[in-house]
């Protein structure tokens, strides 16, 4: 009898009755390669694969929601809206405003070409990056970056005049070419400041550099052509800052006003209404915080996709999940959000393939 009682107790503990998840959650299923190699189906299977594959699948869904949204989708029309906002054709034309942020290492990598594609076809509306994210784009127009190895010894590379970015190598000569190219532009900017009272800001400087580089491989060139603002609040932190420093010894007086840019950046979010706003942020640090902070000015973004490998246990903004930004009012409580814990050089091209690129291909096909 005692054994029966113990068995019954243990059995009921181990085999506790489950709540049914049928119809509430997706079943975990991977891609079946018996059906052949179908890349769109493979990518769709990410949603039900689990772990970060599912997060990537969710990110694809969120970005597609950003791209599909129209003001006409909103069933309620605000009583105090303008007559234009009540017009059905106008409402159908209003799209989500997309902020894209990325760190410099991604421009050092081949992700630069993915970013250039998005800017070239005006698929994003506002860009925020670091100084390295600016100069690496320009320098690649002057000289290439090469693939090396993570394990190459620093002292050896230094003796050869080679700079390592992860497993990428940038010859020091590239920065010499950058100096030769950019210093005359600074001279001309200073002349325009003195003679024409031009007030330079970081974003105006970057537009000018995009114009001057005149190279279709550059995302800055396309941002200039498409009139997409590029913000870089940490302008002096990088080789571009070094060049400004060196230029100040040659001739002083060049002024770059960051206050005008914070007004412009925050204004991109504040004046977005009646549009929704979406954030796609690769990596952390300054671009992530700057975009989120601007969206706080409008009571939060409506969509957010973060792709980075940062962790939140150290309290860094870089590693924070979207929900932390909700607590600050940088993302709305009702927003569609996801963080993908993955190297963006892997995740972002796949995401673009299943979102921006697919939709552009579909649009082009419908026109032919």
UniProtKB/Swiss-Prot annotation:
Keyword field: Hypusine biosynthesis, NAD, Transferase
Recorded GO MF terms: deoxyhypusine synthase activity
Binding, NAD(+): 104-108, 130-132, 136, 237, 284, 309-310, 343-344
Reactions performed catalytically: [eIF5A protein]-L-lysine + spermidine = [eIF5A protein]-deoxyhypusine + propane-1,3-diamine
Pathway(s) annotated for this protein in UniProt: Protein modification; eIF5A hypusination
Family to which the UniProt record says this protein belongs: Belongs to the deoxyhypusine synthase family.
Record protein name field: Deoxyhypusine synthase
Organism: Arabidopsis thaliana
UniProt gene name: DHS
């Amino acid at each position: 009898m005692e054994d029966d009682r113990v068995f019954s107790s243990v059995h009921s503990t181990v085999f506790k009755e489950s709540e049914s998840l049928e119809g509430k959650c997706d079943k975990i299923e991977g891609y079946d390669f018996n059906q052949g190699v179908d890349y769109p189906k493979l990518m769709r299977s990410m949603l039900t694969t689990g772990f970060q594959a599912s997060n990537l699948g969710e990110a694809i869904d969120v970005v597609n929601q950003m791209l599909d949204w129209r003001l006409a989708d909103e069933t309620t029309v605000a009583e105090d809206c303008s007559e234009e906002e009540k017009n059905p054709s106008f409402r159908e034309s209003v799209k989500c405003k997309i902020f894209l942020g990325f760190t410099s290492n991604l421009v050092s990598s081949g992700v630069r070409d993915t970013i250039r594609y998005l800017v070239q076809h005006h698929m994003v509306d506002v860009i925020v990056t670091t100084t390295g994210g600016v100069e690496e784009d320009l320098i690649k127009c002057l000289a290439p970056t090469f693939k090396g190895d993570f394990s190459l010894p620093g002292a050896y590379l230094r003796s050869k005049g080679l700079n390592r970015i992860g497993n990428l190598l940038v010859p020091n000569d590239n920065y010499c070419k950058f100096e030769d190219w950019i210093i005359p532009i600074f001279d001309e900017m200073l002349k325009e400041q003195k003679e024409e009272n031009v007030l330079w800001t970081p974003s105006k400087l970057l537009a000018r550099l995009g114009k001057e580089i005149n190279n279709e491989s550059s995302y800055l060139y396309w941002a200039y052509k498409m009139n997409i603002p590029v913000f870089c609040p940490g302008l002096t932190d990088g080789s571009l800052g070094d060049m400004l420093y060196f230029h100040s010894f040659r001739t002083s007086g060049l002024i770059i006003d960051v206050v005008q840019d914070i007004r412009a950046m925050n204004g991109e979010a504040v004046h977005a209404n009646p549009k929704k706003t979406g954030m796609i942020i690769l990596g952390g640090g300054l671009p992530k915080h700057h975009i989120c902070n601007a969206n706080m000015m409008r009571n939060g973004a409506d969509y957010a996709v973060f792709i980075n490998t940062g962790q939140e246990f150290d309290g860094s903004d870089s590693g924070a999940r979207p929900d932390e930004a909700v607590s600050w009012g940088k993302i709305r409580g009702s927003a569609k959000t996801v963080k993908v814990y993955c190297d963006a050089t892997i995740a972002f091209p796949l995401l673009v393939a299943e979102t921006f690129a697919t939709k552009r291909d579909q649009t082009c096909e419908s026109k032919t």
